[in-house]
């Protein structure tokens, strides 16, 4: 684990991503999260294992380039986003949708 998030692992995970592709990946025990763009794979693994009490077997990360957006005549950039696809060990799961 890197020193950047020492003791603050909850800051690594921003939110789960619920897209059509991410929902299909749930069948294979893979969960997609938006994470801090400075987070390394050991940080992400430690945060997921600590927050959700599961065993992580693999992580794939994607760091797409920032996209330009316009507001009238002003151009700006969207915030940097990093995605992580986390594979869990057999028998582990994360409850993303609370049962009511």
Swiss-Prot record:
The keyword RNA-binding applies. One of its GO terms (molecular function) is rRNA binding. One of the early assembly proteins it binds 23S rRNA. One of the proteins that surrounds the polypeptide exit tunnel on the outside of the ribosome. Forms the main docking site for trigger factor binding to the ribosome. This is Large ribosomal subunit protein uL23. The keyword Repeat does not apply. It comes from Parasynechococcus marenigrum (strain WH8102). Keywords: Ribonucleoprotein, Ribosomal protein, RNA-binding, rRNA-binding. One of its GO terms (biological process) is translation. InterPro entries: Nucleotide-bd_a/b_plait_sf, Ribosomal_uL23-like, Ribosomal_uL23/eL15/eS24_sf, Ribosomal_uL23_CS.
């Amino acid at each position: 684990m890197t020193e950047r998030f020492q003791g603050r692992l909850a800051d690594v995970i921003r939110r789960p991503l619920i897209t059509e592709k991410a929902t299909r990946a749930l069948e294979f025990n893979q969960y997609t999260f938006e994470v801090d763009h400075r987070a390394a794979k050991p940080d992400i693994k430690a945060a997921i294992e600590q927050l959700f009490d599961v065993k992580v077997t693999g992580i794939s990360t994607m760091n797409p380039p920032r996209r330009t957006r316009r507001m009238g005549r002003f151009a700006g950039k969207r915030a940097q986003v990093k995605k992580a696809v986390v594979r869990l060990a057999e028998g582990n799961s994360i409850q993303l949708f609370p049962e009511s």
